[in-house]
Amino acid sequence: MSPVYVNLLGSVGLLAFWYFSYRWIQRKRLEDPLPPWLRKKKACALTRRSRHRLRRQHGVIDGENSETERSVDLVAALLAEAGEESVTEDTEREDTEEEREDEEEENEARTPEVNPMDAEGLSGLAREACEALKKALRRHRFLWQRRRRARLLQHNGPQQSHHAAVFCRVHGLRGFQVSVWLLLTLFWSTGYGVSVRCTYHGTDINVTSNATSMNCRLNCTCNHTQIYNGPCAGAESKLPLNVTFRQSRRQWHSVMLTFGFQYHLEGWFPLRILNESRDINVTEVYGEVACFTNDTNITMGQLTLNLTGRSYVLRALARTSPFESSVNWEETNVTDNATSSENNTVTVMSVLTVYAESDYIFLQDMCPRFLKRSVKLAKNNRRNTTFTGTNVTSLPEWTLQQCQGWKYWTTLSIMWKNRRSALLRAKSRALGHWALLSICTVAAGSIALLSLFCILLIGLRRDLLEDFRYICRDEGSSSTKNDVHWIV
């Protein structure tokens, strides 16, 4: 199963567990706290007035021994069920003041005070926490503004302090919106509509038994602004592309990117094609490495190779796997002065197809970094940069008999071609992101469950303490035990 669906299923399961836990807690809180055997005996029929009289009869004064209210209520219910409720004539002839108190208690019984935690559960507690946080923030902001106003009044006088206070209020109201707008604008403008193209032109091609060389010139532009113009040799070091990583685990990644830039920008790519296709007769070579963003702001890469009138193009789309799309070179723009035959075309296509997957993955990984780095170079006014030096680019000690394929590139391509151990594939990076998201989801679920348990304990701490005290008293009181066994 895809990691995307696994994480989605885990998130849905976590939300469902949270919802049903909340419903179960709410249902348990709304149930009667009395045991079933006592709830069936009409214990809840006692009014607040009769319970008050029973408390007074048993010597419990209002306002004291608040912890024993539940135990007294239980004793009152037991006495009422046993028929031992006796109200003397003296208690019925109370003075006017006591009757008024009884009426007030009856009114309170009709409209009892409901704790928000008991009425709404976790939602009420969350609402109270939000209100408390808002009050604390308003209080903190008020104190900060008052201290700032006093400081401005002390230094600048009353008129200037008034204007400064107005500015602070406006800044406090609009600062967050302005910050969010700037961040969104920066995110939208970064890399959107950027195009970087590096074209090379190779002449005086010389293919011998032990070396392949040519005169090569490279020209790089960023949004039609020139950032490099000079020989192909050494272009990677002269362009501060900064493709290294500090992490030791990404050392191979740095090596591949650096070597890939040299391979495509310094003319080694057409030299490999010419060396392995010795039968074709080529006098000059044109090529291009292009990275750009399309209308939907998706990064795309393109490799172009032109051999005497025949062009070959490889296109790569970021955030896609080479195994999910067709990776192949296409022959386009065949000019009228094409001198190569069909056999030569088949030979070139066979050579290009061998490492098409490696070139595709490299474009996917290189183009986003190349675009960002080129934008920085353009902002640093690195324009019309012209370099001088030798134009000769060669592959020394290179023969088809000594090694099959380009030795350096094939050595590094083995890691890319293997689906399980690929380091630079976009899908592997996506799996890494989903793994991090899975860890964060599990951590968030654990924190949520822990917070739910803590909130439950906080809301029920008083009831738990009363239950523990009642259990302790019940174990130490034999009379209460006898009454309970007698009712059962």
Curated annotation (Swiss-Prot):
Record site: Cleavage site: G193, V194
Family: Belongs to the immediate early glycoprotein family.
GO biological process: symbiont-mediated perturbation of host apoptosis
Keyword Metal-binding in annotation: no
Assigned GO CC terms: host cell endoplasmic reticulum membrane; host cell Golgi membrane; host cell mitochondrial membrane; host cell peroxisome; membrane
Glycan attachment positions: 206, 210, 219, 223, 242, 275, 281, 294, 297, 306, 333, 337, 343, 384, 391
Protein name, UniProt field: UL37 immediate early glycoprotein
Transmembrane domains' residue ranges: 439-459
Keyword Transcription: no
Organism: Human cytomegalovirus (strain Merlin)
Chain intervals with Acidic residues compositional bias: 83-107
InterPro entries assigned: Herpes_UL37_HHV-5-rel
Key words, A-Z: Glycoprotein, Host endoplasmic reticulum, Host Golgi apparatus, Host membrane, Host mitochondrion, Host-virus interaction, Membrane, Modulation of host cell apoptosis by virus, Signal, Transmembrane, Transmembrane helix
Region described as Disordered: spans on this chain: 83-119
Superkingdom in the source lineage: Viruses
UniProt signal peptide: 1-22
Pfam families registered for this protein in UniProt: Herpes_UL37_2
